[in-house]
C-alpha cells in the first residue's frame, strides 16, 4: 500500500479493553458501545474473541448484524478452529475482518509456544490462508513484536503478506519500547520486509511505562498507518493507547504529523462517558481530553487569559471534543418527545419503545426529586435502567434502612432473582454493610467485595449518586453499577448488578490461552 496521510483507527475497547479486571460486558452493553464507536467514526471495531466462549461468539455475531459503517473484526489465535469461528461470527457484517496472531519473540516461542521459528512461520501462513476463505480483509499480528528479532519479523511478515494478509500489526505487548526506538523499528522493519509496501502497517501499544500514546505516534512517524487503541485507554495491566489522545494529538499537531483520521471528535466525550459508566472504570479528573478537569483553570492568571482569549491557555476547545457548554437538559414538565430528542442529541440510542418508555418513567421520577436535569444525569439514568433491563438475574425492587446513633443499622430489602421476589434483612457495621449482608443472606454468592465507590454525577446536594461495586469469585472479577438520588438505593442496585454479571460471566468460560496481543 502506498504511503497515505489517512490513519486507520482500530478500536479494541470491546476486546482488549474488556480484559481489564471487572470490565466484562454483557452482549447488550457491547452492542451499545459498538454503536457509539461507529458514531465516533472508528474504522475498525474489534468486537471480541469469538472462539473464547459461546457468549463471546454471540456478542461478536450480534455486533456484526448491527454495525453497517465500521468494519467488524474478531481476534483469533493462529488455530484453525479459532479462525473458522471468527469467520462465522463476523459473516453478517457488511465489512468484516479476521485478526489472527502468533507470538514471535524468542522467549514466547521457546517457553510459551514451544515451537521453532520455522514452525511459527508455517502456522502463521496457514492461519492467514484459512482466514482468507472468509474475507479479503485479514490482519496478522506478531505478538510481542517489539522484543522480537527484526530479521525474523521481516521473514514472517513477508510470508504472511504473500499468503494474503492485508494489514500487519506490530504490538508492543508488554509496553517495553520507547518512542524513538519504536519509530526506528517500524522504519527498518517495513524496509526489510518483502512486499512491505503493499500492506497497511499497524501499531498496538500497551501502557506499562506510560508511553502507549507516544509509541503509537512514533510508529506513525515510522510508517504505520493504523493504530490500535481503546476508549479511555482501557485495558489490562496499565491499559492501552488512548483513542482520544491519539486522535487529538494528530489533530492539534497536524503541523508536525500531516495525518488525518475519520473521527468525529465531538463524539469523544460521549464515548468516554458511556464506556466509563458501563465498565465501572471512572475517568480520573486530570485525564487528558476527557477528564473533568481537562478544561478547568484554577490559576488567576490563566483564568484571566482564557477570558480574554481562550487560545492563550487552551490548545483545543472543550466543544470540539464533545464537552457541552450548556449542560442544562430537561425539567419535570418535559414530555416524551423532548426526552427522546435529547437522548438522540447525546448519542444515546435505545433499542425499543419498551426501553424508551422505561427510561422516560425513570426520568419523570428523577425530575420529581431534582429540579435541574443535566446531560450527565441522563447518561447515568439510562445506563442504570438498561443495566436493570438487560441483567435479568437480580433486580432491585425496594428497601428500608433504619439507623440510629449507637445502634447497628438495619437493612430490609426486596429484590428479585430471575423474576422471583425475595425479601431479606440484616444488620451491619454501617448501612452499606447491612445492605450487602442482607442481599448475600439470600444470594449466597460467595463473592468477595474488592471495591465500593460513590461518585456524584453532577454538582449540588440533589445530585444522583453513581455507585460502583467490584466483586471477585475465583478468577472472575466483575463491576456493577447503580444510580439514584438515594446513594443507598444506588448501592443496592450496584451490588445486584454485579451479582448478575458474576452469574453471566460464570456461564461463559473462556477458552484456555485466549490471551492478548
Swiss-Prot record:
* Annotated control of activity: Inhibited by 3-bromo substituents and Leu, the pathway end product.
Q: Which GO terms describe its cellular component?
A: cytosol
Q: What domain of life? A: Bacteria
Subcellular locations according to the entry: Cytoplasm
**Keyword tags:** Amino-acid biosynthesis, Branched-chain amino acid biosynthesis, Cytoplasm, Leucine biosynthesis, Manganese, Metal-binding, Transferase
Record's cofactor remark: In vitro Co(2+) and Mn(2+) strongly activate condensation, Mg(2+), Cd(2+), Ni(2+) and Zn(2+) weakly activate.
Per the record's keyword annotation, is Transcription regulation included, yes or no? no
What are the thermal characteristics recorded for this entry?
Optimum temperature is 40 degrees Celsius. Thermostable up to 44 degrees Celsius, in the presence of Leu thermostable to 59 degrees Celsius, in the presence of Leu and 3-methyl-2-oxobutanoate or Leu and acetyl-CoA thermostable until 61-62 degrees Celsius.
- Region Regulatory domain, residue ranges: 395-517
Q: Where is this region: Required for the condensation reaction. Not required to bind substrate?
A: 366-517
Q: Which coenzymes or cofactors are required?
A: Mn(2+)
Domain Pyruvate carboxyltransferase residue range list:
7-269
List the InterPro entries.
Answer: 2-IPM_HCS-like, 2-isopropylmalate_synth_dimer, AIPM/Hcit_synth_CS, Aldolase_TIM, LeuA/HCS_post-cat, LeuA_allosteric_dom_sf, LeuA_bact_synth, PYR_CT
Q: In which pathway does it act?
A: Amino-acid biosynthesis; L-leucine biosynthesis; L-leucine from 3-methyl-2-oxobutanoate: step 1/4
The pH response of activity is noted as:
Optimum pH is 8.5.
Q: Does the keyword Metal-binding apply?
A: yes
Subunit info here reads: Homodimer. Remains a homodimer in the presence of L-leucine.
Q: Which HAMAP family match?
A: LeuA_type1
Q: According to its UniProt record, which protein family does this protein belong to? A: Belongs to the alpha-IPM synthase/homocitrate synthase family. LeuA type 1 subfamily.
Q: What is known of its domains?
A: The N-terminal catalytic domain forms an (alpha/beta)8 TIM barrel and binds Mn(2+). The C-terminus (residues 366 to 517), is important for increased thermostability and for condensation of the 2 substrates. The regulatory domain binds L-Leu (the pathway end product) in the dimer interface.
What's the protein here called? Answer: 2-isopropylmalate synthase
Lineage at the top is:
Bacteria, Pseudomonadati, Pseudomonadota, Betaproteobacteria, Neisseriales
Gene (name only): leuA
Amino acid at each position: 500500500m502506498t504511503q497515505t496521510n489517512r490513519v486507520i483507527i482500530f478500536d479494541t475497547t470491546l476486546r482488549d479493553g474488556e480484559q481489564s479486571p471487572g470490565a466484562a460486558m454483557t452482549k447488550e452493553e457491547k452492542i451499545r458501545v459498538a454503536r457509539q464507536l461507529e458514531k465516533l467514526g472508528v474504522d475498525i471495531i474489534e468486537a471480541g474473541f469469538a472462539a473464547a466462549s459461546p457468549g463471546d461468539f454471540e456478542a461478536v455475531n450480534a455486533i456484526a448484524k448491527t454495525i453497517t459503517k465500521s468494519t467488524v473484526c474478531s481476534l483469533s489465535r493462529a488455530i484453525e478452529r479459532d479462525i473458522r469461528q471468527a469467520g462465522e461470527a463476523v459473516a453478517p457484517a457488511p465489512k468484516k475482518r479476521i485478526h489472527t496472531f502468533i507470538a514471535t519473540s524468542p522467549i514466547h516461542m521457546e517457553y510459551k509456544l514451544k515451537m521453532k521459528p520455522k514452525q511459527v512461520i508455517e502456522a502463521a501462513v496457514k492461519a492467514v490462508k484459512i482466514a482468507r476463505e472468509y474475507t479479503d480483509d485479514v490482519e496478522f499480528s506478531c505478538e510481542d513484536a517489539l522484543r522480537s528479532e527484526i530479521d525474523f519479523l521481516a521473514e514472517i511478515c513477508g510470508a504472511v503478506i504473500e499468503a494474503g494478509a492485508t494489514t500487519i500489526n506490530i504490538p508492543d505487548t508488554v509496553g517495553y519500547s520507547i518512542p524513538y526506538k519504536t519509530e526506528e523499528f517500524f522504519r527498518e522493519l517495513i524496509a526489510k520486509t518483502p512486499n512491505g509496501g503493499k500492506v497497511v502497517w499497524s501499531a498496538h501499544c500497551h501502557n506499562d511505562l506510560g508511553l502507549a500514546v507516544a509509541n503509537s505516534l512514533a510508529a506513525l512517524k515510522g510508517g504505520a498507518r493504523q493504530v490500535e487503541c481503546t476508549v479511555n485507554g482501557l485495558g489490562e495491566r496499565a491499559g492501552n493507547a488512548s483513542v482520544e489522545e491519539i486522535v487529538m494529538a494528530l489533530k492539534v499537531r497536524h503541523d508536525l504529523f500531516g495525518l488525518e483520521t475519520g473521527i468525529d471528535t465531538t463524539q469523544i466525550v460521549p464515548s468516554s462517558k458511556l464506556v466509563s459508566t458501563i465498565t465501572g472504570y471512572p475517568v480520573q479528573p486530570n485525564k487528558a481530553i476527557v477528564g473533568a478537569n481537562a478544561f478547568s483553570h484554577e490559576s488567576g492568571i490563566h483564568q484571566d487569559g482564557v477570558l480574554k482569549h481562550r487560545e492563550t491557555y487552551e490548545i483545543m476547545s472543550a466543544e470540539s471534543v464533545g464537552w457541552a457548554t450548556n449542560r442544562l437538559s430537561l425539567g419535570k414538565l418535559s414530555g416524551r418527545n423532548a426526552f427522546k430528542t435529547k437522548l438522540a442529541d447525546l448519542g444515546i440510542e435505545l433499542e425499543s419503545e419498551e426501553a424508551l418508555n422505561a427510561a422516560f418513567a425513570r426520568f419523570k421520577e428523577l425530575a420529581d426529586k431534582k429540579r435541574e436535569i443535566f446531560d450527565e444525569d441522563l447518561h447515568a439514568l439510562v445506563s442504570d435502567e438498561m443495566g436493570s433491563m438487560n441483567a435479568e438475574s437480580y433486580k432491585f425492587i425496594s428497601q428500608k434502612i433504619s439507623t440510629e446513633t449507637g445502634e447497628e443499622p438495619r437493612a430490609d430489602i426486596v429484590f428479585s432473582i430471575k423474576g422471583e421476589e425475595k425479601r431479606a434483612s440484616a444488620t451491619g457495621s454501617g448501612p452499606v454493610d447491612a445492605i450487602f449482608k442482607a442481599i448475600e443472606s439470600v444470594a449466597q454468592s460467595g463473592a468477595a467485595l474488592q471495591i465500593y465507590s460513590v461518585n456524584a454525577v453532577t454538582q449540588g446536594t440533589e445530585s444522583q449518586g453513581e455507585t460502583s461495586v467490584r466483586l471477585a469469585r475465583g478468577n472472575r472479577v466483575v463491576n456493577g453499577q447503580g444510580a439514584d438520588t438515594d446513594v443507598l438505593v444506588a448501592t443496592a442496585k450496584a451490588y445486584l448488578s454485579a451479582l448478575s454479571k458474576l452469574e453471566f460471566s460464570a456461564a461463559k468460560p473462556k477458552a484456555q490461552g485466549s490471551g492478548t496481543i
